Amino acid sequence: MTKKQNRRKTHRSRSAPNTHQRPKSKTSKEKHDFGKSSARTTNKGISGDVIEGRQAVRELLLAGKRKVREVIFLAGLDPSPVLAEIRDLAAESRVPVYEMARSKFDSIATTESPQGVVSFAEPLLNLEIDDLLSTKKKPFILVLDGIVDPRNLGAILRSAECAGVTGVLLPRHRSTKITPTVAKTAQGAIEHLPIASVSGIPKGISLLKEKGVWTVGLDTNAQTEIYELGVADEPLALVLGSEGKGLGRLSRERCDLIAKIPIFGSIESLNVSVAAAIACFEIAQRRR
């Protein structure tokens, strides 16, 4: 059995029995306010209630961790396996499915290329640091100090989930939230990564250290290379700074150690999402 088939089987075991054939999509009505029932108008946390893109919507339904209010398809899409799977998953979970003409669909979608699928769901749970540490695995937390580009944040979350990061810590201010662009770029990673937020990252680093987490900041000016770290067993947090500015002074001062990814070319630094991917996989390899 493939990994994908096993995940589908697990999803079905959690879902209510589906004794009917897949229902036909409903045609949208002008009076239906799509997404208005979502808590996004009152949610002050990390959001994530608007999901666009085929893989992101598929993972939302497959994870089954939060209520999905509706799935909306652009009318006239060519058939594909992933679209069929989204319809099947929606039917299994009794999620309403609608089809929309191009003009109305474009008025609801917010990303540049939603791939003909939009879904509205309950916002992501805004967790606490203690929640990130309550894991059966060795805690490996990614701390992001002010990422402002949604595509960068989405790419970082995708790489982090693939590398086995057990939780992510974000600041409540001066950082992008989990927008539709973040969710789409993350390709469903937000459904599997516990995400917490704090009022300030320096405070978050201090709280992690109080709870026995070793904190490593990533900075191009560090003396120690990331390949020299000994990170086998202890709970660990990897701290990355914002695009352009890097780690803030207070965040840097509160980390136990500052490390760098060595650069061998002429350009002095990597994109933050690329640096995050390299660092996460390097640490993950050392902790296996």
Predicted features and spans:
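N-terminal positively charged helical leader segments and presequences
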Residues: 1-131
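Structured adenosyl-cofactor binding patch, chiefly the S-adenosyl-L-methionine
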Residues: 63, 162, 184-188, 249-288
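RNA substrate-binding interface of SAM-dependent RNA methyltransferases
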Residues: 73, 81-83, 95, 134-223
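General small-molecule cofactor/ligand-binding pocket signal
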Residues: 96-100, 196, 259
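Short glycine-enriched loops at secondary-structure junctions
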Residues: 103, 123-125, 171-175, 244
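Short, hinge-like loop/turn segments at secondary-structure boundaries
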Residues: 114-118, 184-189, 232-236
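Active-site/ligand-binding-proximal alpha/beta "capping" segment
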Residues: 216-271
